[in-house]
Curated annotation (Swiss-Prot):
Gene name in the database record: rimM
UniProt keyword list: Chaperone, Cytoplasm, Ribosome biogenesis, rRNA processing
Pfam families attached to this UniProt entry: PRC, RimM
Quaternary structure annotation from Swiss-Prot or TrEMBL: Binds ribosomal protein uS19.
Biological-process GO terms, alphabetical: ribosomal small subunit biogenesis; rRNA processing
SUPFAM superfamilies: PRC-barrel domain, Translation proteins
Domain PRC barrel: 93-166
Localization of this protein: Cytoplasm
InterPro entries, per database record: PRC-brl_dom (IPR027275), PRC_barrel-like_sf (IPR011033), RimM (IPR011961), RimM_N (IPR002676), RimM_N_sf (IPR036976), Transl_B-barrel_sf (IPR009000)
Signal sequence, renumbered to the chain: none
Family classification: Belongs to the RimM family.
Protein name, per record: Ribosome maturation factor RimM
Main location: cytoplasm
Species of the source: Exiguobacterium sibiricum (strain DSM 17290 / CCUG 55495 / CIP 109462 / JCM 13490 / 255-15)
Length: 169
């Protein structure tokens, strides 16, 4: 089974077992909803944990796990990653994609390869993709209709029509 990473545990917060997460998932409010199950991976073993509280704090997601009400219960998890089953994903609408489907795709302008999507930034108005280019500076591509012409997640290929000045060097 292929597990999907949804967050990294950055630190603890306070003394009541709250964890500070760096989310790597889309829809964090659904993924970390109270009552949902996430899996903590340690040495290849995936242990289930039930979310008992969720809130946003600055750029972090703050959660507690059921039965873990003290910092001593959770401190050992700092630096570890949280995962979900692929079956936990919901169907998306047309032209909607999960981050894991976009990250790793190769981006092309016509037949010219630009690079590979390495990260997705949420900006509010639209997502922005970071494109890693070998030997060159990264490029930021807005996920808007005027730029992204087509996405083939099966082939891991994205076709764009860059706006003037979007890609330099």
């Amino acid at each position: 089974m292929e597990w999907l990473e949804v967050a990294k545990i950055a630190n603890t917060h306070g003394l009541k077992g709250e964890l500070k997460l760096l989310a790597s998932t889309d829809f964090p409010e659904q993924r970390f909803k109270v009552g949902n199950e996430v899996f903590l991976e340690s040495n290849g073993i995936y242990t289930p944990f039930m979310i008992s509280s969720y809130r946003k704090h600055k750029q972090f997601i703050m959660v507690t796990f059921k039965g873990m009400q003290h910092i001593n219960d959770v401190e050992k998890y700092k630096g570890l990653k949280l995962y979900v089953h692929p079956e936990a994903l919901q169907e998306l609408g047309e032209h909607e994609f999960y981050y894991h489907e976009i990250i790793g795709c190769t981006v092309f302008d016509g037949e010219d390869e630009i690079g590979v999507v390495s990260e997705i930034l949420e900006t509010g108005a639209n997502d922005v993709w970071t494109i890693k280019r070998p030997g060159k500076k990264d490029v930021l591509i807005p996920y808007i209709e005027q730029v992204v012409a087509s996405i083939d997640v099966e082939a891991k290929r994205i076709q764009i029509t860059p706006l003037p000045g979007l890609i330099e060097g």
